[in-house]
């Protein structure tokens, strides 16, 4: 009994898998560029070392799927429903992920330059060592997610929900975070130099070694927040509401005096590595974050 099926070709020379149900398939080292997987159901699927340039996955349903070392540039993942999916060591630039639902996705060692995650639902996603300048995450839901070693320069994270997320070693230089929700979030070594963060909400957040120098923080919310070595140098903090938690004590602070209180956040530094907050140093840290990402990107 022969199980092979003839897959028709698309007009652009790819394969047409649209609306098929594919379970347990393993495709290695194939050219699937311009293929069509629209409305496809993929369960326990593995794509390894494949060229999937301009592939269409619109409305596909993916469960336990792995893209390993694949080229996904200019592909369409809009409105997919993905559960427990992984993108490892992929190039996924200029990809459309808008309105995608990607529960518990794992995205690591991957390039996402200029990709579009508008209104994507990405709860409990794990981003690790990702290069994503100019990425659009406007209105995406990233609550409970974990982000470590990310280059988000010039990215748009406005109105993103990052409630209860963990952000470590993030380069957000010149990015947009207005009305972004960072409530109950843990932030360590997050660099937002020159970013637009008007109306951002940091209530109940825990910030350590973060840089907001030269950023716009007008009307930002920072109530019940723990700050440790946070740099507001030359930031615009007009109309910002802030109370700082120290032990169990809640201390209200006038935003106008915020910048003069730098030393206040530098206490009890013995357990932390010293880092002066000069412009050169911040740039060096941003470069180091990028270097650390790149180290394993190949």
Each language-model region and where it sits:
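Tandem repeat scaffolds
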Residues: 2-287, 294
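Short acidic DE-rich linear segments
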Residues: 296-298
